[in-house]
Amino acid sequence: ASAVGVDAPVVTFGTYEPKDWVSENLRSFKPISVGRFFVHGSHWDEDLPVAKIGLQVDAGLAFGSGEHQTTKGCLAAIDWVAKRGPRHNALDMGCGSGILGMACAKTWRSTVMMADIDAASVRVAQENARVNKIADLVTAIHSNGFQDTRIRDGGYYDIVCANILA
């Protein structure tokens, strides 16, 4: 510290009571309301607000808990599109947690192809679809962009979601 002209930090040692830090952290995530969507974690034990579509997503290994402004913007865009009529076949490219694909599946009860380059994200998206009771509508696959033929063979997508940095 003295080499760069700052005070040395104070270091203390002690014993702390055991605590479930994962549960504590989950409780800190407040539900998010965007358009028709209400994004909440598994710790939310209250009723959904009237006329809202619930999306249960816990913050974790995959991107997309609803906290980031780009995710909120994408959910708002899906809400806007939903006001203009039904969609039948959706693609969520770079799905992360699957939040956008799940929003499509729950809004239109339509089939959704979800893809991500990260295998852990695909597993999280599949589990989130199961928890949200839409696993029958969702196919989540590991793919580097459009390389997997199942994406190209999925037919015409009438809505494509991609909350990614490219």
Question: PLM features: what roles do these ranges have?
Answer:
Residues 1-49:
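N-terminal auxiliary segments of SAM/dcSAM-dependent transferases
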Residues 158-166:
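A short SAM/SAH-binding and catalytic strip from SAM-dependent methyltransferases
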